[in-house]
Structure formats: C-alpha cells, structure tokens
Amino acid sequence: MNQDLALRVMSDIMQWDDDESRKEFRWLKLMARLKYDGYRDFQAGMRFTESLATWLQQFDQEERKDAYRFVKERMVYVGPGEVRRLVEQFFPNTIRQRIVQTVASNLGIKPYTVLTNPDAAAAIKRLSRQTLVLGLSDGARMDIVRHANVGRLSNEQLVLAPQIDTEKWKDLLKNLREDLEDPDALFKIIYLVDDFAGTGTSFLRYKEKDKKWSGKLNRFRTSLFNAISDPEVGNIVAPDWQLCAHHYMATANAKDKMIASENTARKDMKH
C-alpha cells in the first residue's frame, strides 16, 4: 500500500474531516519519514501509516480516538540511530566508569586522580582485560560494541551467547591468561547485555509450576558453575568478581521486577 492510499484509509478509519485530515497527515508523514519507517528489527520494511491503520481497526469507533492519541502522545519509539548511540555509549559511560571506580576504591584514591597515578593506570589496563561482555541476544548489538571499542575491548572479551559451554569458558580463560601473561589470571567483571527489558521476567523468573528459577540470568549461572566444576577449568572468576546486568532500555516496572527477583533468588540459590 502506498502512502497516499494509506493516509486515505486512515482518514476513513478515524472519520476525520478535511481540516483534521490535513493536520494529522502532516504529523503522520513527518513521523513516518523521520522515525517509524526506519524500523529494522522483527518486521523490517513495514510502513508506519499502513501498520497504524491496520492496528486501529481492532477498536470500536469510539475507542479509536483514544488509541490514536495514545500512539501520538504517549508511545516512545527509539529509532536505529538512537539505539546505535546507546550502544556506542555503553563502554565509556558504563563499563569504563565501573572500572575506574573499582580501581580507585581498591587503591583508596579519588576516581578523578586515577589517570595521574601510574599504579592506577596499570590497574585499569589490567582490569579492563579482566572484563567480559556477554550478549544475551542479537539485540545486544555486539557487532556495534566491537566496532565502537577497537583498542578498548578485544574480540575475546565480547561473546554473543546467553549460555556458554565449558569449552568456550576454557578458551576465554586461556586467552585472558595469555594476554596478561599471568597463568593465574581470572575474570573480575562480567556484563550480561541485552537491548530491552519490558517486564523483567525473561531475565529472571521463578516458575511456580516447576518450583525452580528460570531466565537468562539463571542459564548464565548454570553455564558458569558447570565450567567451574570441571577439573580442567576450575576457577574462572576472582573471589571479588562483579556481575552486572545492562539493558540499553528498560521500563521502570522491569527494573523493579528484576531487583526483587534477584533479592529473592539470592536467598534460594546457594553459591
């Protein structure tokens, strides 16, 4: 369906008069061109006006104005360019800040002094290599993370796999120790990365029927401890290691849900 036809269909569905049609057509064309038609994920190539018209037809006539107003005034859409910017800022604004804060705390100095302190600079370089980033889905955009951080993070530190097998853990540990020239080196920071958390349940949830924990965090935990229990692998993470979950976007409800689930899971899981 071309845009002119889609707009006429929208006008019929919403029962707009000529003045309303002219006003709303300007907004629909603008938003389609600047934002919505750039969508490339689950159904790339879908057109905004056509999709909106189809969606609105599920409502009774008296409900359509409210549904349309919701899309126009309340819906938040993050386009490809904005997502890319969020991904590119992940290392400098999140990982780097945690590394600096950790080193400063360990050395008992102020974070703003680390770059002038030779010991701190060396510790930052080492801790940066002891950081591992695991993408939980394609939405983690690990390719963009890799390209945006050449010289900061090596390919061996970026893994797209929600559940790593024992052989992969062995390879990651081997590469870490070779790079640091330290046969006893262990990972100290691990990031679990995904694009969006809407409810928080896919990350961690308790299955009442099965009486067990499930979700991406639990799969990571199982993967890690399976590898640690292998005599050929042993310890992978340092005693004071940090596990961080990072979503490029999340609802407030998902954040609260994940925190609550984590607190409950800590009481249930003994490791």
Map each language-model feature to its residues.
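PRPP-associated nucleotide enzymes
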Residues: 1-271
